[in-house]
């Protein structure tokens, strides 16, 4: 036996997607695009694209820029 929310939630999502979204989305999309602006994607023609310099790698393996230092003291 299937629980009631397992039936009702997909039906409500289908009704929203099929009938309500075409009317609601044009009203909401200008606000969403202001909140989450798209950033331009730049393609680089770098010859060293696959090579990574591991000298400045952080503890978790992510490359960092500039010197990294660990402070044990709190700064007030």
Curated annotation (Swiss-Prot):
Its main location: endoplasmic reticulum. Residues 47-76 are annotated as: Disordered. Interacts with DERL1 and AMFR. InterPro entries: UPF0729_C18orf32-like. Keywords: Endoplasmic reticulum, Lipid droplet. This is UPF0729 protein C18orf32 homolog. It comes from Bos taurus (Bovine). Belongs to the UPF0729 family. Undergoes ER-associated degradation (ERAD). May activate the NF-kappa-B signaling pathway. It is found in: Endoplasmic reticulum; Lipid droplet. Residues 47-56 have a biased composition (Basic and acidic residues). Residues 1-37 are annotated as: Necessary for its localzation to the endoplasmic reticulum and lipid droplets. One of its GO terms (cellular component) is endoplasmic reticulum.
